[in-house]
Amino acid sequence: MSDTWSSIQAHKKQLDSLRERLQRRRKQDSGHLDLRNPEAALSPTFRSDSPVPTAPTSGGPKPSTASAVPELATDPELEKKLLHHLSDLALTLPTDAVSICLAISTPDAPATQDGVESLLQKFAAQELIEVKRGLLQDDAHPTLVTYADHSKLSAMMGAVAEKKGPGEVAGTVTGQKRRAEQDSTTVAAFASSLVSGLNSSASEPAKEPAKKSRKHAASDVDLEIESLLNQQSTKEQQSKKVSQEILELLNTTTAKEQSIVEKFRSRGRAQVQEFCDYGTKEECMKASDADRPCRKLHFRRIINKHTDESLGDCSFLNTCFHMDTCKYVHYEIDACMDSEAPGSKDHTPSQELALTQSVGGDSSADRLFPPQWICCDIRYLDVSILGKFAVVMADPPWDIHMELPYGTLTDDEMRRLNIPVLQDDGFLFLWVTGRAMELGRECLNLWGYERVDEIIWVKTNQLQRIIRTGRTGHWLNHGKEHCLVGVKGNPQGFNQGLDCDVIVAEVRSTSHKPDEIYGMIERLSPGTRKIELFGRPHNVQPNWITLGNQLDGIHLLDPDVVARFKQRYPDGIISKPKNL
């Protein structure tokens, strides 16, 4: 569509140029009638607006062979047929001269392609039609008609029908000669302007390659300029180099950071054993096509009399509450080691040896204070007697509207807890779940903490797979829990960047949080006093004081804490205050 429109606009510009030249020649020259072509003077007035190809006079300059237009006699019948064919509304455009010639040719009056193309150029000059190639003639590429003005073509057909016949021309030759003398100037101007137009048209194809070459050269220059503008200057390169060096220095670990990492690195062999991806020993040998299983840890199926293996594995596995009657398959650790395996003793050092390597290998290891705990109702304990702590961790019994095997606290009771007295500067780790996630954030702000991080515990089952069936969650089964991390004041002496905020660990009993959290906190703040609220017997840890109502009595070793506790509670009984 764009090529057709470009051709139309180019043709219109060419016609405008021819008209301008014709008007200038009319004002400047006074031409004479071409005696060798008297028929030009006898043409109807409606044809006088377009230049008709004529042969040059003997005295005038001869055009070049490439631009010469052969003189063709106009056939009135052919012109009439061509006008009728072009004025047909059913004609599909664009169409070429060859197709038109075949359409209007008859056995009695065959039409030639040269005659058709000559008439098409004539009609194009009269603005009856629009052609793609302008005024040039080329046998290899016939003229292409792109547009036809049906109203002008119909008027032209009427004028041709009223035209006088050849026999009447002789009787009116005197009047025609008089008219020819009056229009001699116009005819001469037509001829001269046509020759100049053909010469300029013939030179246009030769100019097109030159224009294209200039455009290509200009585009190459633009590309070179753009590439030069995109290149960095020497100053920019130096600035970028300095920025890269600063970034490398910032990313390089300092000697202190390397010392801290080395301090917490495991001594000797790692005290963990990796699970096999195939689960049981049978599946491991089948997958590896070997005679014996790999050295990793495997599971053994528990098949009881009531077990139906076709049902598959139990969704709860080792946390199933009805394992003695459950018909699904359960598992246990296959602790039977292959004693005949070569080098097995080298790969399984004894626990005593490993502990000796761990403790004796690091003479600068901090000594841990033994665990301490108090069995009490935290709502009524005066926690101010315990002193200040660097880290506080709490796993509150949130009221999440579920049936739980332990008592819960209301939202107001959680807000009234005297947590701020435990710390001036330090961190608070608060476990939340369900709707308590928003309440936990509210409590952090109420107690004077700013939330700075959030640890995610991704729960796995006994087979080390992501759990898909849990006992928590309203619309979706919960496969993770959150631990909000808040900071208070301006804590100093804490290690940064040693651990990430994701823990992947196996679920155990209800509300039993992963033990990995203790190692993470100890690396964050080694050798400092820490306290855990709402703890249970499995939560007691070295360097920690654990508070909870499920602990076994009172076990305090710090002399200062023991003195303050005896002063506050002489009989050792923590009861509900009378004012509550």
UniProtKB/Swiss-Prot annotation:
Catalysis: reaction(s): an adenosine in mRNA + S-adenosyl-L-methionine = an N(6)-methyladenosine in mRNA + S-adenosyl-L-homocysteine + H(+)
Residue numbers spanned by region Gate loop 1: 396-410
Outcome of swapping S48A: Does not affect nuclear localization, interaction with METTL14 or WTAP or catalytic activity
EC number: 2.1.1.348
Comp. bias intervals (Basic and acidic residues): 28-37
Subcellular location: Nucleus; Nucleus speckle; Cytoplasm
Mutation effect (W475A): Decreased methyltransferase activity
Family, similarity comment: Belongs to the MT-A70-like family.
Protein name as annotated: N(6)-adenosine-methyltransferase catalytic subunit METTL3
Top-level taxonomy: Eukaryota, Metazoa, Chordata, Craniata, Vertebrata
